């Protein structure tokens, strides 16, 4: 191995180390900190926003563009088409669950929450768990099915803060389909719209908290 190859190898190792640190600290440690009370419950959304900002800035420093992170209107229509079947199926499944199993939670959210959820929370979650995560995973050259599974597990894991196993399982499954759709059409438009539709519906009818 010559000096140039050695430098490139070392640079790759450093890059992967930074990426692993970001994933561990933001995608694992932050939810755990909320769960065990190190971060107050009423600061969970502030924590989400701060984590997303840090992850975004580090991604840009690593050389990823907004296009790489899915922040683009290109392929917006195909991205909407990619999530449409799953969104429809999940809506129907949610209605069936509601009819057969009833309400799980009593909705307490006000208009201000839904404005925040639609315009800030959902877009930020999609940036963090689809756009940024997909770009970071590119450095590891994983098989796509493994990447999708890991990403969906991380998305499900963040919901441990609600201390509800059903929510974690559902979000892991939903995360699998959203990440798969994003890999097919790498624009955040489709997955964000799907997230808003499904999220608002399931919260309003009391299926998730």
Task: Place the predicted regions along the sequence by residue.
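Juxtamembrane helix-loop-helix connectors linking adjacent transmembrane helices
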Residues: 33-44, 64-122, 127, 139
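Aromatic-anchored segments of alpha-helical transmembrane domains
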Residues: 24-33, 88-97, 152-160, 197-207
